[in-house]
């Protein structure tokens, strides 16, 4: 009985974990129209973004704000537009995921 309760608690806690972003979410949110995992398109490759921000403790927050509000000047002349279809939580998930791309 104790094992059943432990298993039930473990399963219940999994349902409260945040959904992790991945390439599918990036595709659905139109990020892949300008970015790719490993090559520059209109915007930088995600692996290059991850390398640039590696080791910066506030990198996920910075990138999440760029996803939400857009930005310019970091990667060249073409500005990144704001992304209004992305929620704040999704922006943070996407930014955290981008930082893991190798």
Predicted segment positions?
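Residues in well-ordered alpha-helical elements
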Residues: 24, 61, 88-92
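Axial heme c-ligation environment in periplasmic c-type cytochrome domains
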Residues: 33, 42-53, 66-95
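N-terminal export/targeting leaders of redox proteins
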Residues: 1-22, 102
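C-terminal alpha-helix
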Residues: 97-101
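Sequence/structural segment immediately N-terminal to covalent heme-attachment motifs in c-type
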Residues: 20-37
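Short microdomains enriched in Cys/His and/or Lys/Arg
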Residues: 52-62
